[in-house]
Amino acid sequence: MDLASLRAQQIELASSVIREDRLDKDPPDLIAGADVGFEQGGEVTRAAMVLLKYPSLELVEYKVARIATTMPYIPGFLSFREYPALLAAWEMLSQKPDLVFVDGHGISHPRRLGVASHFGLLVDVPTIGVAKKRLCGKFEPLPSEPGALAPLMDKGEQLAWVWRSKARCNPLFIATGHRVSVDSALAWVQRCMKGYRLPEPTRWADAVASERPAFVSYTANQP
């Protein structure tokens, strides 16, 4: 595995990320959520993609793609492992969203190219990274109450907002993926909350990918 070449690709791709608002439709009609996981000891990559109407946040479509994993897990290079399955799920959608929430990092990455940014560049769609853990940067400790907020900083640059979406839950790291500013990324995530830790697009993507009870009951109630 030529990590030097992958690192150079990351730096080059990151320079093409648009960090300001360039939504084709604002507000969007459809918002997607995307989540990637692995099966069979990592040999299979599974990507779930859901489509929600906005502003109702009603689930209207979901697709799951499974492909052979193309590279091993290497910290800092996860997007190269995840994007092929995301592209496969993207191609399965009957209609394309105006905005995509990706479970993972956007520019809040050591070389400013997390999976939300990488995928956004590949399909040229506005994306937001919604991550559950910090990958780089520093932030001031958050108060315990919901709504607590702090910038994630690295080398004098704001990479994300650290936001406690729910009491007694760890905060989310919300970042520009592509064609969405960091402040708008936070605002869109906040508009898509329904009382859970995760915003509805990535909550549903996770539920579909992992066949959680919410998704099982949803499918049982479909005609």
Swiss-Prot record:
CDD domains listed in its UniProt record: Endonuclease_V
Record EC number: 3.1.21.7
One term of GO molecular function: deoxyribonuclease V activity
Residues marked Interaction with target DNA (site): Y73
Protein name stated in the entry: Endonuclease V
Cross-referenced HAMAP family: Endonuclease_5
Cofactor dependence: Mg(2+)
Catalytic activity: Endonucleolytic cleavage at apurinic or apyrimidinic sites to products with a 5'-phosphate
Keyword Transmembrane assigned: no
Keywords annotated in UniProt: Cytoplasm, DNA damage, DNA repair, Endonuclease, Hydrolase, Magnesium, Metal-binding, Nuclease
Family affiliation: Belongs to the endonuclease V family.
Predominant subcellular localization, coarse grouping: cytoplasm
Keyword set includes Membrane: no
One GO BP annotation of this record: DNA repair
Main function: DNA repair enzyme involved in the repair of deaminated bases. Selectively cleaves double-stranded DNA at the second phosphodiester bond 3' to a deoxyinosine leaving behind the intact lesion on the nicked DNA.
This protein's encoding gene: nfi
Locations listed in the record: Cytoplasm
One of the record's GO cellular component terms: cytoplasm
Pfam entry (one): Endonuclease_5
Family matches, as Gene3D superfamilies: archaeoglobus fulgidus dsm 4304 superfamily
Record: residues binding Mg(2+): D35, D103
Source species taxonomy: Bacteria, Pseudomonadati, Pseudomonadota, Gammaproteobacteria, Enterobacterales
